[in-house]
């Protein structure tokens, strides 16, 4: 159920205040919003969230209720400010904990400089203090090793980003990310236990700083009717065996575009190539429905090549896609996670018919 009522609306020559009240009944969220337009756009809101995380566990023979739950009621004060100058755009966002159970806070800022010929430079800073997920705090299961009731501190993330757009040359993104008190799932092996009970997946919190550097390059090149759209991501973590990331990720599209039959048909066909370097990809635990860090099996260094045909005839669009068609001749050693093979060759097609243009 969703209710939206305009409570107050004042129109002044230099000051405009809009007050809204939002009520999300089903998930217990209440929002009170004020918009102020003076020397920029200012948004102030009051947010109340009530959550209940419950794990039901009953023992029928003994009529025992072992259910566990987490109840959270939190109030936040949110604010945002934006201002546009002739060549500069400024935007600030903040979410501040006032009182309650979930003590999360965030702040983000963006300054963007616009130059000639659609060139721009953007500087960003983000801060997040986020409570761990409920699944890391509380879990109940018939499996002995999958029961816990934890108290973790907030994970604190600071990131600095630079985005440079040089029209017709390249797009450059540089991100430096620092995470403190990071919480994740890990695989714990017990050599003294036999069979499938010799390991468990448990949540762990690291107190040290984890740092990641990411550099992303994007470039689009056009030679007549031929085009190349390339993206390259280079990333390095200073905390190996804690956060596992591929050092190289590449996505490339090579395609040919043309009009045919006196421009009655627009045709586009080409290849899409995806690749990432070998790394210890996170494993998947079906009991928790969570990914966990593993350092036993490396996955990567296999290309995924797709062949596609797109066509447009007046109001109708057609597409044919042969996904991962190289699977049969590049070796069956591709996985989306340890013990979870990536999909083989797949054919897809579709039709879009617009009745009204």
Predicted regions and their residues:
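Exposed, low-structure sequence patches enriched in small/polar residues
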Residues: 1-8, 12-357
């Amino acid at each position: 159920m969703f209710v939206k009522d305009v409570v107050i609306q004042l129109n002044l020559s230099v000051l405009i205040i809009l007050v809204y009240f939002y009520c999300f009944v089903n998930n217990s969220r209440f929002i009170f919003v004020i918009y102020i337009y003076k020397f920029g756009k200012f948004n102030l809101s009051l947010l109340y969230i009530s959550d209940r995380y419950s794990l039901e566990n009953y023992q029928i023979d003994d009529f025992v209720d072992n259910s566990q739950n987490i109840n959270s009621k939190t109030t936040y004060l949110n604010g945002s400010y934006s201002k546009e100058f002739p060549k500069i755009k400024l935007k600030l966002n903040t979410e501040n904990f006032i009182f309650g159970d979930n003590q999360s806070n965030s702040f983000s800022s963006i300054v963007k400089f616009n130059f000639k010929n659609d060139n721009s430079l953007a500087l960003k800073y983000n801060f997040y203090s986020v409570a761990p997920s409920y699944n890391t705090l509380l879990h109940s299961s018939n499996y002995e090793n999958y029961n816990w009731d934890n108290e973790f501190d907030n994970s604190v993330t600071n990131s600095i980003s630079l985005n440079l757009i040089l029209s017709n040359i390249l797009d450059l993104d540089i991100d430096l990310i620092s995470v403190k008190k990071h919480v994740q799932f890990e695989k714990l092996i017990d050599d003294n236990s036999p069979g499938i009970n010799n390991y468990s997946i448990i949540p762990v919190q690291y107190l040290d700083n984890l740092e990641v550097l990411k550099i992303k390059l994007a470039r689009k090149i056009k030679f007549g009717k031929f085009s190349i759209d390339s993206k390259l991501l280079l990333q390095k973590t200073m905390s190996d065996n804690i956060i596992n990331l591929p050092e190289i990720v590449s996505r490339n599209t090579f395609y040919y575009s043309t009009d045919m039959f006196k421009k009655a048909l627009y045709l586009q066909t080409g290849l899409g190539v995806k690749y990432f370097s070998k790394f210890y990809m996170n494993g998947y635990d079906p009991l928790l429905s969570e990914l966990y860090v593993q350092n036993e099996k490396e996955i990567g260094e296999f290309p995924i090549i797709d062949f596609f045909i797109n066509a447009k005839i007046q109001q109708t669009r057609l597409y044919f896609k042969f996904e991962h068609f190289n699977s049969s001749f590049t070796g069956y050693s591709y996985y989306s996670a340890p013990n979870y093979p990536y999909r083989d060759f797949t054919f897809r097609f579709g039709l879009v018919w617009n009745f009204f243009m």
